[in-house]
């Protein structure tokens, strides 16, 4: 059988796999017409008079802030779970650590520290040892000729935890440590010459897992936020829960802003028609946020679960909303989202850990979620389909290259997506039930963020 025939067969199997278990994305009208179940109808009464849920002061204990509101977190140290997952039961002996970075990742095996923030350096960039985040920050600042202002006394601390706090002081430290502006310009000129000699389809060829890993390292939390999620006068959230729910909406808006910048920089995505870009982001932002939450939450699966005999028999108790910030299960139960909380951890986080999913596979799946040719209203569905098929092939090749002995791994990874879609639809029911989504403005917010050439997103390694 020829290589072409093999490729066609693999593509067909992927399509069948997704279409069999993955329902279509609902239109905005369908989402607004969602009728809450009996469970949701009783939700307001249950929250007004809690009887069995733990007594938690939500305004104080709703969020567990570990190391600063915007402080970054390194990728979780993944551990293989060799025990059979029986519900939430996980009483196996902790397995050996799993390597965070694939062999070809820029941070694999680094022995130097970033001269600017002290994080692990990925090499010498523009004259000094630096991490991917500071490298990207300096490059974007020079290329876009950005100017910053310091809100303090121009002597802010720039380290791994606080490098997002002040762009002015971070840029000044880059210069003081020896980063050269001219090196960025020379790099751009070399890239332009390579582009002129490239094949016309180079934009699709550039879509690779390696490129996605670079983008993941450059995306940081937003200094500002969109207003897609909000608690307004028309919201059906009881008064005692409005403050914590508003905090959750604020977190979601910051993550959506960062997501838009990430999507815009994916090779060839920015060349799609702007209306198609908006539809793709609008159709996937909720799934992408939940997927990122599940990925970050792997690190906390065993926290606060031990009984007296030190056996992990209770469900996972913590979910990581964003780097440095967790939500406790008790608070989720009181807010009426306990089912979604448990499903994210049981159907996504635990399965990710069991599969020993690494960051390369994570970013590939994120791109596959975004590049959904079945989104209604696309003008260039074929272009999106080509990009998604490219990501299928990249992920399949990566699985065979890095996990050659694990047959069926590619399919096992894709089978997490139907569960993600199901959880996403359930969470949408809650968002629309309490009028937390500014539906009429979602498209305009996304359009403004996509068209903004100087996004309010600092570039920093996650």
Swiss-Prot record:
DNA-binding region residue numbers: 114-179
Zinc finger residue ranges, NR C4-type: 114-134, 150-174
One function term, GO molecular function aspect: zinc ion binding
SUPFAM superfamilies per the UniProt record, alphabetical: Glucocorticoid receptor-like (DNA-binding domain), Nuclear receptor ligand-binding domain
Compartments it resides in: Nucleus
Residues in NR LBD domain copies: 204-453
Entry keyword tRNA-binding: no
Stretches for region Modulating: 1-113
Region annotation (Hinge) ranges: 180-201
Record has Zinc-finger as a keyword: yes
Tissue: Abundant expression seen in males and ovaries.
CDD domains: NR_DBD_RXR
Classification via InterPro entries: NHR-like_dom_sf (IPR035500), Nucl_hrmn_rcpt_lig-bd (IPR000536), Nuclear_hormone_rcpt_NR2 (IPR050274), Nuclear_hrmn_rcpt (IPR001723), Retinoid-X_rcpt/HNF4 (IPR000003), Znf_hrmn_rcpt (IPR001628), Znf_NHR/GATA (IPR013088)
A cellular component annotation (GO) from this entry: nucleus
UniProt keyword list: DNA-binding, Metal-binding, Nucleus, Receptor, Transcription, Transcription regulation, Zinc, Zinc-finger
Domain-related comment: Composed of three domains: a modulating N-terminal domain, a DNA-binding domain and a C-terminal ligand-binding domain.
Family to which this protein belongs: Belongs to the nuclear hormone receptor family. NR2 subfamily.
Quaternary structure (record): Heterodimer of USP and ECR.
Protein name per UniProt: Protein ultraspiracle homolog
């Amino acid at each position: 059988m020829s290589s072409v025939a093999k490729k066609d067969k693999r593509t067909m199997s992927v399509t069948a796999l997704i279409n069999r278990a993955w329902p279509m994305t609902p239109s905005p009208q369908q989402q607004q017409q969602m009728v809450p179940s009996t469970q949701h109808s009783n939700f307001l009464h249950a929250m007004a008079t809690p009887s069995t849920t733990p007594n938690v002061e939500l305004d104080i204990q709703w969020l567990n802030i570990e190391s600063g509101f915007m402080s970054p977190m390194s990728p979780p140290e993944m551990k293989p779970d060799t025990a059979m997952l029986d519900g939430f039961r996980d009483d196996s002996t902790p397995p050996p650590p799993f390597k965070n970075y694939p062999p070809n990742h820029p941070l694999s095996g680094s022995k130097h520290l970033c001269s600017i923030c002290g994080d692990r350096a990925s090499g010498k960039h523009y004259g000094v040892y630096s991490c991917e985040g500071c490298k990207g920050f300096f490059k974007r600042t020079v290329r876009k000729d950005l100017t910053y202002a310091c809100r303090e006394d121009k002597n802010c601390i720039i380290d791994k935890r606080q490098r997002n706090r002040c762009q002015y002081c971070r840029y000044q430290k880059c210069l003081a440590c020896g980063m050269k502006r001219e090196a960025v310009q020379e790099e751009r000129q070399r890239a332009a010459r390579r582009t002129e000699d490239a094949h016309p389809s180079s934009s699709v060829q550039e879509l690779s897992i390696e490129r996605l890993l670079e983008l993941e390292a450059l995306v940081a939390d937003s200094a500002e936020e969109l207003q897609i999620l909000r608690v307004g006068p028309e919201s059906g959230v009881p008064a005692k829960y409005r403050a914590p729910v508003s905090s959750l909406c604020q977190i979601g808006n910051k993550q959506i802003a960062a997501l838009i910048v990430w999507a815009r920089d994916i090779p060839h995505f920015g060349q799609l028609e702007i209306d198609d870009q908006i539809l793709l982001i609008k159709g996937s932002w909720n799934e992408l946020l939940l997927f990122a939450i599940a990925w970050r939450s792997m690190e906390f699966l065993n926290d606060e679960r031990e009984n007296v005999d030190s056996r992990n028999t209770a469900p996972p108790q913590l979910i990581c909303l964003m780097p440095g910030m967790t939500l406790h299960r008790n608070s989720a139960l009181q807010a009426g989202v306990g089912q979604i909380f448990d499903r994210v951890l049981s159907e996504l986080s635990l399965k990710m850990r069991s599969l020993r999913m690494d960051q390369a596979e994570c970013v590939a799946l994120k791109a596959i979620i975004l590049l959904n040719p079945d989104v209604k209203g696309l003008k260039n569905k074929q272009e999106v389909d080509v990009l998604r098929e490219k990501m299928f092939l990249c992920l399949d090749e990566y699985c065979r290259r890095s996990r050659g002995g694990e047959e069926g791994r590619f399919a096992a990874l894709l089978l997490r997506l139907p569960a993600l879609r199901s959880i996403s639809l359930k969470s949408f029911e809650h968002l629309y039930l309490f009028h937390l989504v500014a539906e009429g403005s979602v498209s305009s917010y996304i359009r403004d963020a996509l068209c903004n050439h100087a996004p309010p997103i600092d570039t920093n390694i996650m």
